[in-house]
């Protein structure tokens, strides 16, 4: 059994989590570790996560992590400390588990890693190989842990007052193909929570709420084979 600690969307407030990050084998952050995505905030985050006591740390970027989109592989390598794996449409194997991580999400204002729905974003999901145990994406798939209340749809000039599913349909199709044991995401702060669908456990690990307040707890996930148990004692 491997214990995963999952967090997302800390938006530069990771320092306030000292003492609140539980022990585990793997610490995962699924993006938006900064607020404005500048070099200083990004470097501070990687220093912080590199100091965490978990044996393995895996990170993907999110739409707020602007600087990460244009860094070369060499620049990323110089920023990411030992013991931390940064995934960008790429994978790794840790503790016998196969991971794949991608920062892209359907176009959302003028942020980083935007891809239009349809063929442009689908080509990223097509990169995900079969046999992945744990899929990490910044944004959720459509219809699962993706409800956004008071969602403003600028394309038609309407503000929705009921929860609206804003996740990616193409990602959901990819997940149906891949059938990972676990999918961890963030991005939609209001959709913090978990669900199980078609044998996959889905986690939205957003720590911040819509007001960027640290209100949610990290997820503790025990994974063994195709089984995932959520430890809710934290």
Where are these regions (language model features)?
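Active-site-proximal loop/helix segments of hydrolase catalytic cores
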Residues: 11, 17-20, 112-132, 136-150
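Charged helix-capping and loop-helix junction motifs
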Residues: 42-46, 73-77, 116-121, 164-171
